[in-house]
Amino acid sequence: MFTGLVEAIGVVKDVQGTIDNGFAMKIEAPQILDDCHTGDSIAVNGTCLTVTDFDRYHFTVGIAPESLRLTNLGQCKAGDPVNLERAVLSSTRMGGHFVQGHVDTVAEIVEKKQDGEAIDFTFRPRDPFVLKYIVYKGYIALDGTSLTITHVDDSTFSIMMISYTQSKVIMAKKNVGDLVNVEVDQIGKYTEKLVEAHIADWIKKTQA
């Protein structure tokens, strides 16, 4: 579990293919490795990954084929920056929202414009089904960053990034055409499942 508050920006040092068609990615991030252990969970661009090796300055994670299909991590190469967040502790302040690190899809930046010191981004998701879980003023995690929806329609959604956040995450430097990882707020998914089950149960009872 994560909060969507990025702790550090790491730098990809190496990416190697693995025999299971996945990747092994080595990331430089000494600022978050003081209490690192093999098996720890770290969100990389919002994707929950497991630490397989580490030293004082770097850690390595394995990226499964499913994660490569659903995320933008397959585009990462040596020198690229990535958002990083360690899994929450019981003492962690929940300053963002509950983020699982299970990316639903990617979205393309279709508009980026300055609004005073803030930046307005508009995105088109690759898989439109996620739009039903996105609501005005609701939460969304983009590349692991907890953000608030400012607009949503039948094909796109928008957020505003304040100047403070711009200096803490990688998305501020992304441009039109770039991809971001999308994880919608889980509350919508749970609500949908409960409602569907309730309706199905009601139909069975009325037809009995």
Swiss-Prot record:
It catalyses: 2 6,7-dimethyl-8-(1-D-ribityl)lumazine + H(+) = 5-amino-6-(D-ribitylamino)uracil + riboflavin. 2,4-dihydroxypteridine 1 binds at residues 4-6, 146-148, 160-165. Pfam families: Lum_binding. Catalyzes the dismutation of two molecules of 6,7-dimethyl-8-ribityllumazine, resulting in the formation of riboflavin and 5-amino-6-(D-ribitylamino)uracil. Keywords: Repeat, Riboflavin biosynthesis, Transferase. Its EC number is 2.5.1.9. Gene3D superfamilies: 2.40.30.20. Lumazine-binding repeats lie at residues 1-97, 98-195. PANTHER family: RIBOFLAVIN SYNTHASE, RIBOFLAVIN SYNTHASE ALPHA CHAIN. This is Riboflavin synthase. It comes from the Eukaryota. Homotrimer. One of its GO terms (cellular component) is nucleus.
